[in-house]
Amino acid sequence: MLPLSLLKTAQGHPMLVELKSGETYNGHLVNCDTWMNIHLREVICTSKDGDRFWRMPDCYIRGNTIKYLRVPDEVIDKVQEETKSRADRKPPGVGRGRGRGREEGSGARQVRGAGRDVMMQVAKAWVEVRGRGASAGKSGGRGGRGRG
């Protein structure tokens, strides 16, 4: 479970945010963005010492100042159910890039022409010839692109 998916699911729920400075903020999550910046409503801020309290209608917390977040268990359960249902709907291997080496299926690329094995043999033969110092144009067979 990713932290941002957890925060997106926690919108509208109460949460506790502790900052690196030691202050804590209790409130209802309104919104969060990709940098984990958080907007809370009906906030109670507690000082680092725990002896002073402030009530605010809303507050914005920058993501890189957050030490940890405490969300209700029901939100965590809901996220786990969503990720499980998402995994059940999608067959394995779908949506994870182009993949490699599969010839069956709708997204597979069909091999045309001489085929991969023949092309590999040609490439190996070319490397062997170049490696033995055979003359290859202006460069004299010493590698490089032959400039000069």
UniProtKB/Swiss-Prot annotation:
The keyword Nucleus applies. PROSITE patterns: SM (PS52002). The keyword Transmembrane does not apply. One of its GO terms (cellular component) is spliceosomal complex. Residues 80-91 have a biased composition (Basic and acidic residues). Keywords: mRNA processing, mRNA splicing, Nucleus, Ribonucleoprotein, RNA-binding, Spliceosome. It is found in: Nucleus. Residues 2-75 form the Sm domain. SMART domains: Sm. InterPro entries: Lsm4, LSm4/Sm_D1/D3, LSM_dom_sf, Sm, Sm_dom_euk/arc. One of its GO terms (molecular function) is RNA binding. Residues 80-115 are annotated as: Disordered. One of its GO terms (biological process) is nuclear-transcribed mRNA catabolic process. Its main location: nucleus. LSm subunits form a heteromer with a doughnut shape. Belongs to the snRNP Sm proteins family. Binds specifically to the 3'-terminal U-tract of U6 snRNA. This is Probable U6 snRNA-associated Sm-like protein LSm4.
